[in-house]
Amino acid sequence: AKVRELGKWDNTLIMFLADNGACPEQPNTTPDIPPGPVESYRTISVGWANASNTPYRKFKSTDYEGGIRTPFIAHWPGVIKPGMTNQVGHIIDVSATFREITGAKYPKEILGKKTKPPPGKSLLPIFKGKERKPHKEIYWRFNRANAVRQGELKVVRAGKSWELYDLKADPTETKNLAKERPKKTAELAQMWEDWNEDCKIRPK
């Protein structure tokens, strides 16, 4: 309401997104606290978490689509026309979007230390109804949940072995192609390992 009062509604960008799929932890962690306060913590158990992410596989803490494919809503009346898009975006794109819109520059140094340019591609072309050149690859890591997507191909590791899926033909990740395409699986898996090393991250 305040934005409307200021006459800035048409030129204000509002984004809403979820950070992961439904939470599979056991429910009633804080049964005596009603939902809402910071002290409350509501979860829905494995079964309902899986159902909540239908038709996608799995849930939060995994890098299957049920854990990482989430809603993203952007509202900017002066720029965005109502509609939907199937173009792929990622949380890393949010910073790049704001920097393009505002003209802000990412600092080359912070506290005297050189920085790496942050990953991400601006979502502004998508907001304007254009086709954006997609990411070459997108990477994920959460503890022992690992994945990298290249176009419509995606490798996922939930344990020791990498799995390969064609998201265009199989968005629910039910047909593991790793044995049929071992070279591609190994190629993408090595790309993830190289990225992980570059990030200086060690799996737990």
Language-model region placement:
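Loop/turn elements at helix/coil->beta-strand transitions in domains of secreted/extracellular proteins
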Residues: 8-14, 133-135, 150-153, 184
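C-terminal structured subdomain/cap of oxidoreductase catalytic cores
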Residues: 167, 177-185
